[in-house]
Amino acid sequence: MIKLLKFDGHWLVAEVEEIPGTELGDPDCVLKYACEVNEDGALPFPAYSDDTELVVRSENITVIAEPSSMFSALYYDLKDKREE
């Protein structure tokens, strides 16, 4: 399931997956096909990288919510293009 999240000051839409059994302070979740969103649209995140899975610490995520239908559609469009 995709989520809208605020990660280190960036608004992202991504599939979020928990990594079980991690130590405190270690990266404990995976963001898949993350894209940064704003009023102009969406771009792959992080910029300048072709990585589609980012291992991050959940403590760097300050907000988690359901994305709007518009940003969900943008996310799936970008994901489809990156999978090609």
Language-model-detected regions and their locations in the chain:
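Conserved RNA-binding domains used in RNP assembly and mRNA/RNA metabolism
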Residues: 1-84
